[in-house]
Amino acid sequence: MNWDTLKGVLKTRRLTKRTIPAYIHPTSRSDSTSSTQSATAGFILNEEPITLFRLELERLQYILHFPEEVAFQLSSTEYQLFYSIQPMDYVRYVSCDLTSVPVSENPSPVRNLVKRLSEVSSWITHVIVSQPTHDDRKVALTAILRIVETCWNIGNFNAAVEVLMGLKSEKLRPFWLSLRQEEKSQFDSLCETLLPANQALPSQAYINAVQRALRMPQSRVIPFFGIFLRDLYAIVNDLPNIVVIGQEGETQKLEFMSDPNGEDHFSSRIGVGGLLNADKINLVAIVLDNLELFHRHSRTMIKLLEEQAVPPIQIPQNEREQKEKEAKTYEPVQVVRGSSHGVALIPLDTLTFDLDVIQRLQHGTTVIHYEPDSGRSNLCLLRLDPSCGQINWHKISYSVNKDPKEKDVLAKVSVSNLQPLDSGRGAPSPMPSGRTPGTGGVGVEEGELKLSVVKGVELVDSYDIDIEAIYRRHSMEEMSVPVSCWKVSHGQLLSDNEFIYFLAPQQIAQFWTNGLQSVVKSLQGQQRYPDRRMLWIKNVYLSLYEITGESNCGPRPFEALQAFGLSQTNTNATRPNDSSLSSEPGGAKSRLKNLKNAMQKKLRGASREGSRSQSPQPHSPLVRPPSIKSQISSQSGPPGPNSPGYLLKPRGEPANSDAGDIDSIYTPRSRTPTSSSYGGRSVGGRSCKSWRSRGGETPNSGSISSSGQMSIQVSGLSGPSGKEFQEKPLTLVEFAELFRLFNTRMRKDLRDVFNDVLSTATTPQHCPKRERDRHSPRMQSRLASVSNSYNADFLSNDFLTRNTAVTSHHISEKQNKIYNALALASVNSMGGLMDTSRSSMLTPQMLRAFVNTHQMEQIDEQTAIKLIQDHEPDGICRQKNQMSFEGFTRFLCDPVNFAFVPETIEPDEEDLRYPLSHYYINSSHNTYLTGHQLKGPSSSEMYRQVLLTGCRCVELDCWDGDDGLPLIYHGHTLVSKIGFRQVVEIIKKSAFITSDLPVILSIENHCSLQQQAKMAQMFKTVLGDLLVSNFLFEADFSDSPRLPCPLQMKNKILIKNKKMIVDPPTPLPMIERGAVQRGETQLNLHRKQSKNSYESSTVDEVEDDDLDEFLDDEENEEDDQEEVQVRSEKEDSPKTSKRAEKSARNIKQQDSLCSDHSVEQAKPSTSKTTSKTNDRKTEDEVLYAQLAQNAIRNQQPRKNNTGVQIAPELSDIVIYMQATKFKGFPPVDGIQSPRIMEEGPASASLSFSSRARTPSNLLNTPAPPRRQRSSTQLSQELAAEFLGSVRANATATCYQVTSLNENAAKKLMKRHPAKCVSYTRDHLIRTYPSAKHYDSSNFNPINCWAHGMQMVALNFQTPDVIMAVNQAMFEQSGNCGYQLKPRCLWDESHLLYNKFLPLSKDIAGHSALLLNLTIISGQHVYPNTHYASLYVEIEVIGIHNDCVREKSKVVQRNSVNPIWNHTTQLRIACVDLAFLRIAVCDSGQNGRVVAHRVVPVKCIRPGFRHLPLRTPTNLPIDNAMIFLRTRFEQEEHIYLHDDDSNTYCNLEHTLAYRTDLTPNLSPTPILKKQIFVLRITGAFADETAITVHSESGSTVKTVMQQALLNAGKNADQVEEYVLIEESLPAPSGEDPIEQRVLPLNEPIMDAVACWNGSMRRFVLRKKGSDPSSRAWITSIIKSGTSGSSTSVSPSPLTKDGHVKSASSNQLHGRSLDTDAFGEHLEVTEGKWLNPRARSMGDTFLVCVHNVSEDQPYAILRAGIHSTAADIIRQVFVKARRSNVDDSEFVLVEETCDDPKLNQGQSMLQALSLARKRSNDLTPKYPNNRTTSRVLGQNENVWKAQSRWKSMGRFVLENRKDTVHATLEKEFHEMAKIIREGIPKKDETYYMIYYSGLPGEDI
């Protein structure tokens, strides 16, 4: 027997009411008196009531104006009470109650539930009766009904029944009679749902609500216990315990013994034929199973909450994935009002949220909204929007309305949202459609706040706000429960920080703070997703969503297309009014006609081919599915296997399928052979071509009318089905699918890329027609409808680019075709027709080739197949592993293909193991300011927001407060002041949320000693273990200390302030004492600590006071006319500021800025007080004299010292960041400034060792013996001292931090660039803006970064381009706040170590990185505007030589998909400090930037990529992107002169972009591009050579233009000059000089290729108008054609009078192996030794001809030991002919012995021969003058080339094609004969023949 049997028993059998308590089954309101009396009679024991819950209820009565809090606290108590009772206790209670056991003596704990029911109901009655007036009773009733509603909403059905039973008391009958019927409607509805009259079973609404509560794993569901007792009473009373078996032959076999009689109520019929009633046992078991179902749900909830408390990072990956699969979505117990749109901005599931808290917030609670500025407060109802996109509140009141404005408040409050699931869901979320993006309207009585701009939610302490005083304004009673306050900080920009304050009782406040924090965190996570288009789609959908009365509707298709970018002028239609909702066809036809007419005008004159093309879309099931909510309801499954009927009832019915054939909407018509062919597939995989052959028509087919105009005839749009889908409001899934179709159809740029990929494929991949025709869309849809299942209502962020089950489940094929036609027509109305033909598909091989070649990512075929499965929408194509254009578009638009994705970058721990001085540190200037430097507010919230951006160094300007506590503000200005302690507390809370790397607090200290001590105490008490107050590492205790690495200082806070040191207690010995003794004394003095002296270690202040910069006139900088002497022996010191001169006026010091060389070369000081010393002092004496002098200076009285004294408490916590005044660069070999250059990873060990480390920055020159002895002795003494007393070397200069303002830093970098770079390797420098930035603007930090300065403090409150550059710098390291400096600044192994000078022009001479950039198009680049005229501005922000800016053309009136196709090549010398900025500008607003993006160049991924744009304030834009193509090339310089190779070098520029497709594989190496470095003389009078970079295809004109540009002659025209190639005289001086004028269009490298065997140069000469100049030019031209040479006086190029070969190192007496030639070669002073043979030390240049059809020759740099086989392989590598077998080719040497060819005609002859194949070469030379031979495979090419005495060259030939192949074959045959023996007379012949074989001359 099942529950149906029980239900039948309960319906057919009459229940005995005398045996069932009235509180379990009240019949009607008329019976309420007897029911209450009966219930009360059961709760009286010895005439004294039982009041177990009196204290709780009295406490709750004081907060009745917070009804939700009352409901929450009632639920908390009853939840514990209900689940503490086991199911069997209900049976025990019923059995005892039926035996008349008093309630007080009933052993079952169910009696506590019965007692609570009685007390709560009596309390509710008392609350209303005790009110003094009728109005007060009505107010109390409103609050009580809100309690019932809240209990129903959260699943506490037990408390709802308890309260309703109290309202049904007979004592309230007069009150109910006094109310109008509309005032009692809500009460009647509640009673009908929870207390149905004359029903044995609960109402259907109750059953549905219980089912929803059980489906939510985290709901605190509490069923009404009386239902279970009533079922047990019915079973026990109406069913007998024993069944008597009848006699054989009797008609009735069983006889129920239901009425025991007799005196003792025993049965009078007792026999052996009785059986236990199994039906009764089964029915009792069902009731117990129902109770167990709730208990099981409770245990699951507790377990789930415990798992949520564990951080996700601690959960294993496999378990996390399993939990994600098992996570259940959000379905509240009661449908939230306004949730009909079904939109959720965040995924509401059990994995992330406590869904019970979410539903409580969405139903709303009563809170107090407080406004601190005005002091006003109001009682408001605060709700979380169903989309979780905003919160809104409005004023309510639970007191008597005295204000006439509040007459409708009670009516608003009393409206109940208690309604059945299938009814209307009320109003949608109030998302304003016309409001500009912002925070929303914020008011005291009413307002809304978008959560996208919320920054944080936190509780407020009572000492910040007087919570009790605010609460008393709204309550006459005392605070019976704790009241909490929380604030919501919001603002769009970092400096926009506004607060909204709310107050509420304890549980409401807890739910709001925890729930809102989780919602905001999840929403911020959604906003951090790289592709934010789905978030944009949801917001647009909500803004278009409408409500008209009780009917809810979303946007229609044409309204959606307008939002996507379709012009309203194109549609010529407006949004229909409410009457359009009717089924009247007239309005639909008129709007459709307007849309068609507008599209017809746009399509007028277009070709038939484009209008008929249509791309198929994903297949969809034939059956139209139900809505998302009903789908969840129908698939959520039953609560339990043994649940009764009301828990097992199905919750939904399948929707009716669409009637009719999906193809019936198309009208067949005949096709002509001239109609356009259409390949590819329709929806579901059917070929549209074959479909047309059956007479079908594409949805976007057009016909040419007699007038030549095209009329749009979109099949199906004119039929009833087409109108249905055009007029039908869109759901969110349909809205997103329509956007996806629109976005695909408008991408003509992607179509071009797709066609290019197809055209470059070796074999076209076509889908066979017959095979396509086999697949019917109908069958495919049916299969999909069977296989696909969907049970989620949240559209993920990758919905637009990856395959999900949502689209196929919710969109039918008919809808898809209609939407596809609309999208294509709307795109065609915006511009040219879109070709959507699908005749070809991409195969995995083609996709792999595209990714490997263009995207520069190495993937295999399996990865390509996976990409197809992920992105291809067509199921048939996926089965065949083919990718259509739609899939290709999705693939390129996916975030894995974005150009730069900083959101996915994680810090690399291997890059965090170097000293702090090796990093750029994200730093803030005057962090507390929100705007102007001189006026405006200060905010402690700025510290939180700045730290959350990843900043790791914040500034605190500390001043004395009037109350004895320090304050933070900008001194002597008009800015406001904030508390010091408040700032420190915020820093502690926010320091390590974004990054766990160390935070530096830069203190600008202006406080007295007393308040400094308080500062130190606050630091210690608030920060606790986070504060670094001691030296921590082994290196700190050695004589060679170093700064710790960021990884060692995780979760630590460092204080940067001045450090206190001591004055020596006794005078120093005389300077004349020994150097060793002086050094020892000085070191000991620096290591002692004194308790009596509290003065600073520096004479001057740490930093120039910003106040003086703002109040005093800034000193004008003097223009330095002298050039920067990079390698000069002496450098002038920078000017000292006025403050430094004033404070150090009487101080005797020696400026160490005077020299950057060793102390051995230092001159005596020019200071007046410095005694003259001997110039021949040893290094020790000079060094220790300086140390002693500094100590004497510190010992002198400091009467003129204006520095602030330091409290010892504050000084003790200054460890690694000791602020000092910059007084110059230290000596290179100073003991107090050791340099640790062993750049291996820093040790993280905390153990201490006595081993002293040796400094590694000693000079490379050998030191004098005395110096060595002194150092050894000193090291031993220091080691002994270290062992004796382990004390950190606190005075080491590596711990000193210098602060410079912008102007001082500029002077320092300009005058001492090399010293600045060297100093910052071991020391930290902080720079900050100068006084001219009083408006809080920023200065460019790249120049400071380029010189190694680590902390460039910027004004974070100003979101300008500089801040965007700063953000991009630290985005490449995952926003951790630390970015490793370029290796050339600190790595000794780098080629530019000690050579990198950012301001020098020589930096451009090194090999650079070439960025070939094409800005193809943009998508939605102008937010909220579709028709602007835009252009793109491209800018490289970097060092001076890399900066460049250019603009593209203007695209008129199109900001939806403008196509620019702007290509440029950017040459970048310093890639690590180069940033690419792409800005979209509006030409109609004077070039105003509407969107931009700044990215690091080295992080840009090559290939076709999308780059998300940001606002001018650097905030992400949801839907704006730039589509670009990038290609990197690495310059490989080939130097033709020795001096160039000594000055410049080839650098390997490494890129840091990440490959998301194959993260475990390294990206494809950068292609190298050969650049030939030429020298051109003649541009200057002194014959100074100009360096010019040339490519293999550069013409003479291009080289001349570059030479004039480099010479500064930009105004000169190339036609005014000639470029002359002339030969240099031989050392003997006998040969004449040859000259030739090069034609402008001749490739320059053709001339260089013919330099083999000769020494030549290029000379630039300007043409003259005088006769002598014309004659000179004419004579040179004639000499080049007639064969005669013209002798001219040679121009001295070098000291030796000849051009050096391209060598970086000279050959010094290198012996050459000439055994292969059989003779000895004289190479030391040989006349004919080619200079190329001595180039580059061990390399030389060689030119090989006849490389390929498209490459006549190749110039290589090869090693001098390279063989012919090596050269051949190198030629093929350069020519990129990897599929050639190099063993089939040989190298042929051709030389000419004709002296005439070596004269004037030689160049022209060689140039003509260079471009011909080898079989055309020999006739050009006379046979008796030309010598050819094949080089052996192992023959040395350099030696062969060195033997040339005339013109020669190497030619690459196939071994089979050369004539020497025959000779080789004959040679092998003759060699065989010789081995066998030959006659003597023939030996001479064979030896002669042998001499002509390969390897020797012929």
Swiss-Prot record:
Domain (C2): residue spans on this chain: 1391-1517
Chain ranges of the Ras-associating domain: 1570-1665, 1738-1857
Region (Disordered): 419-444, 569-722, 1082-1178, 1238-1274, 1680-1711
Active site: H925, H970
EC number(s) stated in the UniProt entry for this protein: 3.1.4.11
Biased composition (Basic residues): 590-605
PANTHER family reported for this sequence: 1-PHOSPHATIDYLINOSITOL 4,5-BISPHOSPHATE PHOSPHODIESTERASE EPSILON-1, PHOSPHOINOSITIDE-SPECIFIC PHOSPHOLIPASE C FAMILY PROTEIN
The name this protein goes by in its record: 1-phosphatidylinositol 4,5-bisphosphate phosphodiesterase epsilon-1
Gene ablation phenotype (knockout): RNAi-mediated knockdown results in 52 percent of animals arrested at the embryonic stage. RNAi-mediated knockdown in larvae causes a severe decrease in brood size. In 20 percent of animals, spermatheca dilatation is impaired causing oocyte retention in the gonad and persistent triggering of ovulatory contractions. In L4 larvae, results in a shortened lifespan. Prevents transcription factor hlh-30 nuclear translocation and increases lifespan in response to S.aureus infection.
Domain annotation PI-PLC X-box: ranges: 910-1058
Organism: Caenorhabditis elegans
Note on domains (UniProt): Only Ras-associating 1 domain is involved in the binding to let-60.
A GO biological process held by the record: activation of immune response
Keywords, alphabetical: Calcium, Guanine-nucleotide releasing factor, Hydrolase, Lipid degradation, Lipid metabolism, Metal-binding, Repeat, Transducer
Tissue-level expression: Expressed in the spermatheca, vulva, intestine and excretory cells. Expressed in sensory neurons AWC, AFD, ASE, ASG and BAG, interneurons, ventral nerve cord neurons and tail neurons. Expressed in body muscles.
Catalytically driven reaction(s): a 1,2-diacyl-sn-glycero-3-phospho-(1D-myo-inositol-4,5-bisphosphate) + H2O = 1D-myo-inositol 1,4,5-trisphosphate + a 1,2-diacyl-sn-glycerol + H(+)
Compositional bias annotation for Low complexity: 625-637, 666-687, 701-716, 1163-1172, 1242-1253, 1680-1694
